[in-house]
């Protein structure tokens, strides 16, 4: 489905330290700012019971804004044992630098999510698996 347009609701604007759930509730505070806009695709469902996630590259977008963006790639991610892939969206095809930044972000994000899941008593592996 890369190259197709998706509607994404922004839950975490670029530069934000606050990760929110699809309903807007605060999920956690990050020690580092999110380097990308991060949101969800309404009307979809991932294995974790939440809507599919999407990263939107580019300028900072307002919290709660709805944007139509082009899918450029997809990363494979496991969160507390549940398959939780993420769409990567941008106006133009991804450069090598952008791909490395996204991969690096999800490697670090997986470490943080492992800690959060352990504190919350969630079982199962949490890890970044690479590009789909």
Language model: regions and residue ranges:
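Hydrophobic N-terminal alpha-helices or hydrophobic patches in metabolic proteins across all domains
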Residues: 1-132
């Amino acid at each position: 489905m890369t190259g197709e347009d998706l509607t994404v609701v922004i839950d975490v604007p670029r530069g934000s330290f606050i990760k929110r759930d699809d309903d807007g509730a605060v999920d956690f505070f990050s020690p580092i700012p999110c380097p990308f806009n991060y949101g969800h695709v309404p009307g979809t469902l991932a294995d974790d019971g939440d809507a599919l996630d999407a990263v939107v590259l580019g300028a900072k977008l307002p919290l709660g804004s709805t944007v139509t963006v082009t899918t450029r790639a997809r990363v494979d991610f496991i969160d507390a044992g549940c398959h939780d892939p993420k769409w990567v969206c941008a106006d133009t095809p991804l450069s090598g630098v952008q791909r490395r930044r996204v991969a690096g972000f999800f490697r670090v994000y997986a470490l943080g999510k492992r800690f959060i899941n352990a504190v919350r008593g969630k079982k199962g592996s949490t890890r970044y698996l690479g590009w789909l």
